[in-house]
Amino acid sequence: MTSHPVSVHIVPSHFINQLAISADFLSTRDICQLSQSFNTWLKDVFIENDINDLLSARAVFVDAILKKLWCQHHLDEFQITLIAVGGYGRGELHPQSDVDILLLTQEEVDLELEEKISSFITQLWDIKLDIGHSVRSIKECLKQAVKEVTVATNLMEMRQVAGNETLTQQLTPLLSEDVFWTSEKFFIAKCKEQEARHQQYRGAAYTLEPNLKANPGGLRDIQTIAWVAKRHFSADSLEELVEHDYLYPNEFFELLESQDYLWRMRFALHFVAGRSENRLLFDYQADVAKMMGFGDEGKAPVERMMKRFFRIIARVTELNTMLLQHFEQAIIKKPELSNISIINQDFELVDKLINTRNDRIFMRPVKMIEMFLIIAQEPGIKGIHSHTMRLMRNARRRLISGLIDYAECRRMFMAIIRHPRGLGLALTLMHRHSILSSYLPLWRNIAGQMQFDLFHAYSVDEHSYRVIKNLHQFSQKEHNHKFPLCSKIVQKIRKPEVLYLAGFFHDIGKGRGGDHAKLGAVDALTFCLSHQLSKHDSNMVAWLVEHHLLMSVTAQRRDINDENVIRTFGEIVRDEAHLNYLYCLTVADMRGTNESLWNNWKANLLEELYFNTLSAFRHGLEKPVEVRSKIRENQQQALALLNENNVDEQSIKALWREFRIDYFLRYSPEQIARQCQNIVEHDREKPLVLISPIPYRGGTEVFIFTKEKNNTFASTVSFLVTKKLSIHDAKIITTKTGYTVNTFVVLDSRNKPLRERFYTKEMSQALVDRLQQVNICELPEPKLARHMKKFKVPLRVNFIKIHAKNRTMIEIIALDRPGLLSNISQVFLEARVNIHSAKITTFGEKADDVFTISTEEDDALTTQEKEALALRLTQEID
């Protein structure tokens, strides 16, 4: 129990004086006004005051309010005690935190007291305090606490605010008895509680918008350390744990520094949000960064704030792991009962945890890397012993240069990379305990580095770690079913370490200004040569780093069925070996950026680009496919499929005479057969809409055949947007007879193909009705999602050089807001521009849409027409 009263010197006396029990009666309105003034004062003094004083100041102020109202409601005349519990009990009260109180009573509460308690609590709500309260006798307190560890934890931090001291004195000693909670049971319960919380708050969503309290490495992890030790040692503060040798002084100061930073973030967040909020939503991040003194110019302040945040939660996570394990090994378990086996003269295995046999072992830095090589070599090792963690943390701080400077460390590091299990537990522990930063100073530069956007879910070091883990997963046969092509490639590669090192370095140039891929390529080459890789392998790693974005950009923004696109891509890639490495690196990179954004559509695009390029290599890049031969082949295969379905061949050939040749180049034989069968069986006076039940490239294909009208594309886009579907690809072809063939590939709001047959049938009819309207209906004003409102993406219009002489390629980059594609299509419509294809890509909050267009006369746009279109897009969209 926290027995001492909270006090703080910085609270202006006039606030406390007005709340003195002897002062005048205060109404609800009086207290609300006083609270408002106090909060204004808190905000004004935030930047120059110690956060501990600010938290105590609010607890002191709330104490004064409660004492005043306690007397105004005459509760001081009864045998009842007002006790602060939880964070309020510790004297740590943020601006909008819940005020948790216990009203401790005698066994029986009579009607008069019940009414006074009710009016007291009601007034607390009226003055806008977020009150969490319980009314219990001592017996009821103990009964609930024994059942629920959260109640027990709250009582451990209780502090009397007002009322009868006798009741408090009766309860306090009972909380120290083993019948309440033994150290061991309490420890196990808190560990389970933490494990469940970590599971709940993992993932991209809680990395982009972290919960300062509940996230792994957050405030709750610091509190868990304190609670466990408090239960065992009866300590009231982290500082007391140093006296018990549970914490070392440097660990205490590290925890204190981490706690102070997280507290300051949470304190500022409460003011910015105007409510009790622990999740650092995008809406608040810029304002919190400004309030904390990071500045307010662009994205940099948020990125600086978050970089420090991610470094701090990594430190807290490490300390939490080490200290809880230390508690279990030194206090809960009996060391003499441990199962110990000798590994070598320097290391041993203690209950499956690697431990040093000599406390001075890490005086030789090479031993740190050797330990991780042993972890890779010994499959029975499950982790690092807390004693060894302590030694390693201290040795890490003593390093005056990177471990990379030692030749033996370089040899062992490459042995870890090359070992079949090296990128399993060994890499995970090297990342978790900052050994990668100790080894490679360049890695330290990216540790915790965030980009203020919705696309990159992880800090650069965490993303790079995930990419390496993805690449390693491809080498393991038990994961073959997840990514069969990647697994097949990686398991045949003679030197997978080339691929792994590309994963290490692909983003290491970020944050330095300039092209991060080129900067990283230089770093990678230097690293590889210093680690005795051959010149060929070193150049391969450097090439992969420099071109690591090439395949994703080509697959998502270009027509990968266009032989010119494949030829250009193939010329850069050079050969099948480079293609194999690049494909696997690209899949691992895209999956490791934000798992919620990876989908079958992207997977299929990459795979199709891979096979198209592989085919081009095997036929020879210098030998382009003969167009007439390709058309003839597609027609023959489509006709064979149609004949199987007994479709009249003459009707099909008559239809084909209406099509231009690009139709037979841009669709597969299967698509041609399905589309043409439906067209010849359909009444041409009405639009034909087909929504394929079979996923196409991981999406759903929406096919339209209708009389050509200027607004067909714009009308379809606006319709699909209202159905909350995202468009990823579009092809538009006109026939010689005044009809248009439009194909869209769409995904639902979960990034999945449409599954509901009823829904697709209903939607087909609704789209037919929409296409039969003379004019496009006015769209309702789209609402921007909550998390998008703080982002600004300046509109950029770029014209891209392509081979086709009668086409123009335009790239439009803008904020990915609802209705953007509809707006763009409307501008094209009004500018009398024909759309032939569209590749729609989103990178978090940024839309990057590429269109192939032409004039009404089927020509490429002139320079003057390009300038006019760019201006019009800027005026309408920006």
UniProtKB/Swiss-Prot annotation:
EC number: 2.7.7.59, 3.1.4.-
Domain ACT positions: 701-779, 809-878
Regulation: Uridylyltransferase (UTase) activity is inhibited by glutamine, while glutamine activates uridylyl-removing (UR) activity.
Cofactor: Mg(2+)
PANTHER family named in the record: BIFUNCTIONAL URIDYLYLTRANSFERASE/URIDYLYL-REMOVING ENZYME, BIFUNCTIONAL URIDYLYLTRANSFERASE_URIDYLYL-REMOVING ENZYME
Family per record: Belongs to the GlnD family.
Protein name: Bifunctional uridylyltransferase/uridylyl-removing enzyme
Name of the gene this protein is made from: glnD
